[in-house]
């Protein structure tokens, strides 16, 4: 198993917590301070890249996953696809709706033009909460013909049960709270 201690230290030290955001009862993990710290960002990207060194494509989840996904793809020499929130891409798109801890949403990727068929994909995002977003992302890229070889996140909020929802996928979280 890869040692992620430098990444864990950076995330633990730099994460900003916001209670009752974006709505009452939700505790939001803001990783922006981790990303804005050059060393913190570097060790986090390196740790996420170590999760699946042979992946062909990174599926980066809108929006903070974009920051991580681009870095991980660059580190691995792989491609990256931005998994967008609904309405951000021109048609045709593939879409997947899901429930998250404070509402519902839909994710989209371009239909047919990004060549995912048969390719290995690592899904990357910042936080695992209920698992709705990551499950929808995995199902979405699978609907495009990709093989999801793993999911990697910076921070997992264990009490929200996301890991159980993602049980069929190998999952790495750098920090679990």
Swiss-Prot record:
Q: Which InterPro entries match?
A: Ade_phspho_trans, PRibTrfase_dom, PRTase-like, UPRTase/APRTase
Report whether Glycosyltransferase shows up as a keyword of the record: yes
Annotated coiled-coil positions are: none
Keyword Glycosyltransferase applies:
yes
* Pathway participation: Purine metabolism; AMP biosynthesis via salvage pathway; AMP from adenine: step 1/1
**E.C. designation(s):** 2.4.2.7
Family annotation (Pfam families): Pribosyltran (PF00156)
Listed CDD domains: PRTases_typeI
Q: Its principal location? A: cytoplasm
GO CC entries: cytoplasm
Q: Which GO terms describe its molecular function?
A: adenine binding; adenine phosphoribosyltransferase activity; AMP binding
Question: What are the record keywords, sorted?
Answer: Cytoplasm, Glycosyltransferase, Purine salvage, Transferase
Q: Which reaction does it catalyse?
A: AMP + diphosphate = 5-phospho-alpha-D-ribose 1-diphosphate + adenine
Could you tell me where this protein is found in the cell? Cytoplasm
Q: Membrane spanning segments where?
A: none
Q: What is its quaternary makeup?
A: Homodimer.
Please describe what this protein does: Catalyzes a salvage reaction resulting in the formation of AMP, that is energically less costly than de novo synthesis.
The family note in this entry says: Belongs to the purine/pyrimidine phosphoribosyltransferase family.
This one is known as Adenine phosphoribosyltransferase
Q: Can you name the source organism?
A: Rhodococcus opacus (strain B4)
